[in-house]
From Swiss-Prot:
PROSITE patterns: ABC_TRANSPORTER_1, ABC_TRANSPORTER_2, LOLD. This is Lipoprotein-releasing system ATP-binding protein LolD. GO terms for cellular component: plasma membrane. Part of the ABC transporter complex LolCDE involved in the translocation of mature outer membrane-directed lipoproteins, from the inner membrane to the periplasmic chaperone, LolA. Responsible for the formation of the LolA-lipoprotein complex in an ATP-dependent manner. One of its GO terms (biological process) is lipoprotein localization to outer membrane. It comes from the Bacteria. Residues 7-227 form the ABC transporter domain. It comes from Pseudomonas syringae pv. tomato (strain ATCC BAA-871 / DC3000). It is found in: Cell inner membrane. The lineage of its organism: Bacteria, Pseudomonadati, Pseudomonadota, Gammaproteobacteria, Pseudomonadales. Belongs to the ABC transporter superfamily. Lipoprotein translocase (TC 3.A.1.125) family.
Amino acid sequence: MSDKAVLSCRNLGKSYEEGPESVVVLSGLQLELHPGERVAIVGTSGSGKSTLLNLLGGLDTPSEGSVWLAGEELSALGEKARGLLRNRALGFVYQFHHLLPEFTALENVCMPLLIGRTAIPEARQRATALLERVGLGHRLAHKPSELSGGERQRVAIARALINQPGLVMLDEPTGNLDHHTAQGIQDLMRELSTSSRTAFLIVTHDMSLARQMDRILRLEGGRLVEA
């Protein structure tokens, strides 16, 4: 693996047993993602895009091959160490926001910092600044049930960015957003890829979003190909 890559996988594969049959979902995948790079993965429904994100993010175990995140081979780490690495080096935005319903927007964004033992005043200050950056400075005290779908997604994106990770993975990040808000998220990603050298890996059906990335990869037949 290149020591400059924030994410790398080699010969990555995933299969499932269905009775006597082995169903191959992904096979022989190769990928390197470098600081500041923005890559989109596109493909039809059921092609394995979400499975791939889960493997790359250490949320699932591959059947073959290896994944390296921030210089660490995920399969060589225990569950606790893997969780700490994800919290430090990776931000993840799901298609559905997965915000904690009992906490406010500010508290949700603070959570990764508090897990990493950042002092509460500093965590609140940094989370407030980031929520203001995504246009939600006036919604800090609102719980997810009091926010629109687009607002909840922006809170989730802020939460993914709060630790200033080297890599952010996003699963259909603009699917619930109007055009203006979606463009704002795209602009923020572009800015961070330049100013902070944050890398972004995005799974999307939105080709207008994919075309704004540096590279587009298509997942078909269980393999990644340049689109």
